[in-house]
Amino acid sequence: MTSVGPPHSTRLYYRPTPLLREVVAACSALARPFRPTPWAVNRHLQLALLAFADGHDLPLLYDRCNVLRLGDGGCVSLEWSGLDADPATPTVVVLPTVCGDGQSMRRLVRDLRAHLGWRVVVCNRRGHGTLPLTTPRFSVLGSVADLRVQLAEIRRQVPGSPLYGVGVSAGSGLLVRALGEDGDATPFTAAIASCPGYDTTRAFGRVHRPYDRYLTRMLKAHFLERHAYVLRGHAGYAEGLTSRTVEEFQDRCHPLAGFASVADYHAATNPMAVAERIRVPLLVLNAADDPVCVVENVLEHLGLVDVVAESLIALTSRGSHCAFFEGTRRPGSWAHRVIAQYLRAVDDALRPRPRTSGRPEERAAAGTHPST
């Protein structure tokens, strides 16, 4: 496929299983075309609006922050919102962007709390947010082993709560990798990957040039310059500082992630290497005009819906990278509405509750198909 259809269309790719028919029928935001904010239609203006919103939203005061010490001396943290929810209320586990933390995810957290009323916990990786980097170890894509420590603590604190995963950009890669590695043993009931790059051995080499330069500078500042006190002198530090692209940065910093070679690093972190082992419902959101996680990545992996039975790929023509702003006077995130509706629909489908009306009308479908 070389185009994504008429302006503002949303294409849905999925196998019409009973679960996905019910879920798609229940997600009104997916049924209607995504119409970007009229004065922020293109990818650049969407990202400008995202930067403005991130810079002007009030900080979110989380209910609690748990700092977890890891076996090698490193530390990660959990930031909780909605701790007063009933013990059986579902919990959304948020995995942030490449440099993200609880504050950068605050609009998503607020929207999930407003739309769902569920508990939300953000998993902060090593050296992110206010966390110090206490050992010379970090990974651009995060660590599944570290995530398992966080999930074990979440399960300890809310043992009766169903867990739903939401990964954003780089966080989606970590989430998909964990889902694939764990297979049937995953603690997640369902998951959402928002703006993923898919194959991380290729995705970073496709980032549009102006954004590639910007992200490379950001990665150097966030991972290396900020933590020079612990990283300076270690293999990968000087090499990372001389990187000119995101792809170079990721590859040159592999020793700081604990790997002897670039090949070993990719074998242990690439989400698509294990994606076929995912056993829970998965929604994937992408925009065709995304300059960071480009549409070619999506089109090369539409076959995901054939190997992951309950997977659904939603591809919009507009929305840019992690933006998806709609509305005029007070623009909000279409993606956040979709995420909330999907989580509610899957939870309703997998944990049936008494209803006063019949089952939602199912959309007729046959085979893997696009729907606009």
Regions found by a protein language model. Name each.
Residues 288-293:
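Acidic catalytic loop of the alpha/beta-hydrolase fold
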Residues 126-164:
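Catalytic nucleophile-loop/oxyanion-hole region of alpha/beta-hydrolase
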Residues 252-274:
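Active-site nucleophile elbow and catalytic-triad environment of alpha/beta-hydrolase enzymes
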Residues 278, 284-286:
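Short beta-strand/loop motif that positions the catalytic acidic residue
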Residues 43-84, 325:
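N-terminal cap/lid segment of alpha/beta-hydrolase-fold proteins
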Residues 2-18, 156, 160-257:
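Alpha/beta-hydrolase-fold enzymes
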Residues 319-332:
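Catalytic histidine-centered segment of alpha/beta-hydrolase-like enzymes
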Residues 81-134, 153:
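Short, surface-exposed "cap/lid" segments of acyl-processing enzymes
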